Amino acid sequence: MNCHVGTKDMKIRKILFGLIFVLICSVGCGPEPAVDLFSNEETSTEQVAEIEHDSTREKYNKGSCKRLTDSPYVLVIFVDDEESSWDTIAVSNYWYENVIPAMAYIEDQANGYGISLSMETGSYATDTSREMSVKYDGIISNYTGDAKATEDLLEQCAVSLGFEDEYQMHEYLQSHTGKEQIVYMIAVNKPGRSYCMSTASNSEYLEHCVLYTVYPTNKVENSMCVAHEFFHLFGAEDLYDPYGKQPRRAELAKEFYPDDIMFRRDEDVYQLSVGSFTAYTLGWTDEMPEECNRQDWWE
């Protein structure tokens, strides 16, 4: 299989990448995806009509993760850096305690809105027996206040795996899996505040999540965090006002969506739900909830 990307195309993509406005909310021709390590080979059985993008859900149908009405391929990259690493046991524990429950939860929530998702999953991780190394050259920052803190993380992961860059890896995965949408979730085995790198522009930017295993307060992260960041990739918005810009929306969310996964945390992800506004931002429904059709929700 030839996955070569032309030099001219590469330069154009690099220029486009530099012009993209990224929003932080708070992922031979190269090795085979490690679907043999952890995989779910089921495929989507149902699709719903595409919903057009509009100004009330500005990141829906944008970037590389456009619609959560089509089952995407989910790739978890377990990356090492100069101060942290993954071993086989840690990878296995994170996979079965966080990733698998999160994917099941997302599929269950989608089903409640009449959306049938059956997501295929795979992973990359350092494997000395296969001479595979997933390594970031340097220290992965856990500071989410700077949009450039980990802007080269996905690229470095791709290069360490033998690809020319993240775009070649993306094209390879699309070809290998037959999926247009690839969800990148980069897991880092150290404390930090997990976040999502997403875009509201029509661009080639490869949206992705950065997931830390431990919250800055030393609280171990769980499947709720994985699902929360996953939803961000497809347009879901925080309802708890993390940046102090929409205090009124947070008040209204507490009244109307107290158990929404985009509003609060919980040790048990099934104590949380996808409320009607979050479903709207994901494109699971095209009807704006009445309680959100008010001026102070948007101020």
Language-model features, listed with the residues they occupy:
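Active-site-proximal segment of zinc-dependent metalloprotease catalytic domains
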Residues: 58-69, 83-84, 148-243
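Bacterial N-terminal signal peptides
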Residues: 18-26
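Sec-dependent signal peptide cleavage junction
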Residues: 27-41
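Intrinsically disordered, low-complexity serine/threonine-rich repeat tracts
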Residues: 39-49
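Propeptide-to-catalytic entry region of secreted or membrane-anchored zinc metalloproteases
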Residues: 48-176
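Bacterial N-terminal signal peptides that target proteins for export
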Residues: 9-16
